[in-house]
A protein has these predicted regions:
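Penicillin-recognizing serine hydrolase domain
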Residues: 20-174
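Substrate-binding clefts and substrate-entry loops adjacent to catalytic sites
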Residues: 4-17, 44
Length: 174
């Protein structure tokens, strides 16, 4: 739920499960950020919502994503389009979670390859953002974009930006 459906509630629950409190989880996040050498990032909110002391750069996010994609379980979640949860009494068929990336894409295909996965984001100050992974001409690319026009209720300009960049990569690397 934290990645596919972009659920802030899932992030808060995960933080409490891992560290006991959201504040303790933030301490872990900032410690890991330092260990990874993310010099322009500081986390002050586990959901990613706006907070004056919560900031990063596209470079740092790309470095973080690159490290995370090296973990098999994260790679699997990040590149999943839909996932159905285990059935419960309240939801006998489970709950289908869909990646927020794919609601903005008609096709995953781009020249020479395809978009494998991504995580969307939005705050008023950061605009529409996207961290994505594509494979083009047998090579993988990470792209992080920010400050795209629009909001959660408009066209996905952050996704359009990524598709355009990936198309150019595909055309130039044939």
């Amino acid at each position: 739920g934290a990645i596919l459906a972009s659920g802030g509630d899932c992030c808060m629950t995960m933080a409490r499960e891992v560290a006991g409190t959201e504040q303790d989880f933030l301490k872990l996040m900032n410690k890991k950020s330092e260990e990874l050498g993310l010099e322009n990032s500081h986390f002050a909110d586990v959901t990613g919502f706006h907070h004056d002391d919560n900031y990063s750069t596209v470079k740092d996010i790309a470095e973080l994503l690159n490290k995370a994609l090296g973990k098999e379980e994260f790679y699997k979640v990040f590149t999943t389009n839909t996932y159905t949860t285990t059935a419960t009494e309240e939801h006998p068929e489970g709950i289908e979670l869909k990646s927020t990336l794919y609601k903005n894409l008609d096709t995953f295909e781009v020249t020479g390859g395809k978009i494998l996965g991504g995580k969307t984001g939005y705050t008023e100050s950061a605009g529409l953002c996207l961290a994505s992974l594509a494979e083009i001409n047998d090579r993988k690319y990470i792209l992080v974009t920010a400050k795209a026009d629009g909001n959660l209720f408009t066209e996905g300009f952050h996704v359009t930006d990524a598709v355009n960049v990936y198309e150019q990569i595909g055309k130039s690397t044939k």
